[in-house]
């Protein structure tokens, strides 16, 4: 499933290292703002926290080769629903359309391309058991988007780095999500989806020279 969905999926699994930061939310409306803000700011996150210019010990033309790899990965990227009015139900409906990577029943059981929705409906050809909450938690953990929801919101676009940089990322997003959320959300709601997506695709190579809404990051 992974290599079929993205040509660098296995590189992502075995050859990259990033920082993942978890944030709590207080309500569905609070979740929506944090989730969407995190997604809209992905180009800036990549540019600020780029730290992977090498591949196999050789320089590349990227500030963040890791993010270039992740952009060619199955089940990754920016979720299209991040540009829409968000609810828990909409997130759930979107997530269950992803193909299942595996289910665990004392061993790993692989599907034949079925989605988690198929699993819920009893159409998992290699398994007759009903889907349960643990299966859904496993499925959530196999979604590799730039921002994802589990029991918390996870921001995932930062390259791994040393301790000083490692502390900066959580502090940056804590300030935005918990102290300037409404103001930041108001700003990003003026941005066009296509401009955010273009900046997202360009940011691993252009870094802070990436343009978004007519301005360099």
Question: Model-found features: residue ranges?
Answer:
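Acidic, His- and aromatic-enriched active-site or binding-groove loops in soluble protein domains
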Residues: 1-12
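Short, functionally important structural connectors and interaction interfaces within domains
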Residues: 4-5, 17, 136-139
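Short coil/turn linker and secondary-structure boundary residues
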Residues: 4-5, 26, 191
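C-terminal accessory/tail domains of diverse enzymes
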Residues: 12, 29-36, 40, 44-217
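Short, conserved phosphate-binding/catalytic loop or strand-edge motifs used
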Residues: 13-19
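Short hydrophobic/aromatic beta-strand micro-patches
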Residues: 22-24
């Amino acid at each position: 499933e992974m290599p079929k969905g993205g040509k660098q999926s296995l590189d992502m699994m075995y050859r990259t290292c990033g920082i993942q930061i978890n944030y709590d939310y207080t309500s569905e409306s609070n979740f929506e703002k944090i989730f969407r803000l995190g997604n809209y700011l992905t180009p800036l996150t990549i540019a600020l926290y780029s730290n992977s210019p090498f591949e196999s010990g050789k320089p590349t033309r990227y500030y963040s080769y890791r993010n270039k790899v992740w952009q060619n990965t199955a089940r990754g990227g920016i979720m299209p629903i991040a540009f829409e009015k968000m609810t828990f139900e909409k997130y759930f409906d979107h997530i269950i359309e992803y193909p299942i990577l595996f289910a665990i029943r004392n061993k790993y059981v692989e599907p034949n391309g079925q989605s988690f929705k198929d699993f819920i409906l009893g159409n998992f050809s290699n398994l007759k058991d009903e889907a349960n909450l643990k299966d859904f938690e496993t499925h959530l953990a196999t979604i590799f988007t730039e921002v994802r929801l589990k029991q918390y919101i996870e921001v995932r676009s930062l390259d791994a780095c040393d301790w000083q940089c490692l502390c900066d990322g959580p502090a940056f997003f804590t300030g935005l999500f918990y102290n300037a959320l409404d103001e930041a959300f108001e700003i990003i709601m003026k941005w066009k989806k296509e401009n955010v997506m273009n900046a997202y695709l360009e940011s691993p190579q252009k870094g802070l020279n990436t343009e978004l809404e007519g301005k360099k990051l």
